[in-house]
Design a protein with these regions (language model features):
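Glycine-rich adenosine-cofactor-binding loop
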Residues: 52-68
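Beta-loop-alpha module in the N-terminal Rossmann-like domain of NAD(P)-dependent dehydrogenases
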Residues: 99-144, 148-162
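Hydrophobic residues in well-ordered beta-strands that form the structural core
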Residues: 145-146, 170-172, 300
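A contiguous active-site-proximal alpha/beta segment in oxidoreductase catalytic domains
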Residues: 150-209
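Rossmann-like dinucleotide-binding domain that binds NAD(P)(H)
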Residues: 209-286
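NAD(P)-dinucleotide binding in Rossmann-like oxidoreductases
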Residues: 269-334
């Protein structure tokens, strides 16, 4: 839904609701982000002379880059953005102007080859994420790759291979596990032993059939949306207990929304993810999570309210605003190149990049083929080896 074209009363109600959910500053930048996406310039702004302290590049200047990546970079570190790129020169110019960057362009190579840039945030169209990441790693840059980091197995293999060859480090844009509530969920569940039960219900926006997500090369909504929750459940299962993973789809006409998927992990843990997209959700994506391991029962709503029960103890955590972990994700990525609390972030491992990508790619296969699939192992292939993640069932 294009909020800029809605009646004024709708806009007022939407903004007022978001102030309650996110606070005034976050709501303001979200509103600006909506207008940024459609802004055009009669005369493009002049580029600025090179200035010291600006060392970050952004590839893709859509709403997410504007209202999350650039916003949290400036909030935490000031004016550190050196150059930005988008296929739309107007979006690039808008982000450049709002966040006081030095350079804007439609040429990704100009950002990747800039010697002043040592960290690249990739938030472009999904099919380009891995391609830009491989090029940036080859140029010695560290990279933050927004989800999904790949849309095909050949990209996953090339990305993992590039990680072994580059001095650059990598982070992925799966923000939820590192939110305050996400960290608390994992801490509480990992205080117990044995297998777990996880249940996600997600209500997302319906999007038009001609939306760019649905272009064959972009991977659809499993890779564009569902990967957030496949990654979350993967990270809740201890690495040594994950494999094999049995993926069972439940679907009707569609293969990437109004669907459910269940996973049985190697230790007997079971996860169910239900993704509904039937209309407009006024408060944004809605999420409800429940889990049980040992004596711990978890219930969570919208990364705002969490209830933890352990035998006779009951703990309620209610945050003032929703926090999906975006700020923490940006701060962790910035620490790839600038120390945080005295040390650099080493980034994610090649094994994790493979495993979370393999899981959402196999989930997409299972839903499209409407059959059970088994992922036998989480071991990345050797350089030049074949992919595919596992056999069918």
């Amino acid at each position: 839904m294009d909020y800029t074209k809605q009646p004024i009363l709708f806009k007022i109600r939407k903004a007022a609701r978001y102030v309650r959910l996110y606070g005034v500053r976050r709501t303001l930048v979200k509103v600006k982000g909506q207008y940024h996406s459609t802004r055009t310039f009669a005369t493009l702004p002049a580029e600025r002379a090179e200035r010291t302290g600006r060392h970050v590049g952004i590839l893709g200047c859509g709403n997410f880059a504007f209202s999350h990546i650039a916003y949290y970079l400036r909030k935490n570190y000031g004016s550190v953005i050196r150059g930005v790129m988008d296929p739309s020169i107007h979006k690039a110019a808008s982000l450049f102007e709002e966040y006081d960057a030095d350079d804007y362009t439609t040429d990704a190579k100009r950002i990747i080859d800039d010697p002043q840039i040592d960290l690249v945030f990739i938030a472009s169209n999904h099919a380009s994420h891995a391609e830009y990441a491989v090029d940036a790693l080859a140029a010695g840059k560290s990279v933050h790759i927004e989800k999904p980091h790949v849309v095909r197995y050949d990209q996953l293999e090339r990305l993992c291979d590039a990680m072994t060859r580059s001095p650059g480090r990598v982070t992925l844009g799966f923000n939820r596990p590192n939110s305050a509530i996400g960290r608390e969920i994992r801490k509480q569940l990992w205080s117990q032993s044995g297998s777990s039960m996880f249940n996600w219900f997600i209500a997302g926006h319906a999007i038009a059939p001609d939306h760019w997500y649905y272009k064959p090369e972009e991977g659809g909504r499993v890779l564009g949306n569902l990967c957030h929750w496949t990654d979350f459940v993967l990270q809740l299962v201890p690495p040594e207990a994950r494999y094999p993973i049995t993926v069972t789809p439940t679907r009707a006409e569609k293969s990437d929304c109004d669907i459910a998927v269940t996973y049985v992990f190697g230790d007997g843990s079971i996860a169910a993810i239900t993704f509904s997209a039937k209309g407009h959700t006024f408060e944004g994506v809605r999420e409800r999570f429940a889990a049980h391991r040992g004596n711990v029962l978890i219930s969570m709503d919208d990364f705002k309210d969490l209830v933890v029960e352990n035998l006779d103890r009951k703990q309620r955590i209610s945050q003032l605003f929703r926090d999906h972990g975006h700020q923490e994700a940006i701060r962790a990525s910035y620490a790839l190149v600038r120390p945080r609390d005295g040390k650099l972030n080493e980034g994610v491992t090649r094994e994790y990049v493979w495993q979370t990508g393999d899981l959402f790619l196999r989930t997409k296969d299972a839903l499209e083929q409407n059959r059970v699939l088994v992922i036998e192992s989480g071991e990345p292939p050797t350089s030049g080896g074949g992919g595919g993640g596992g056999g069918g069932g």
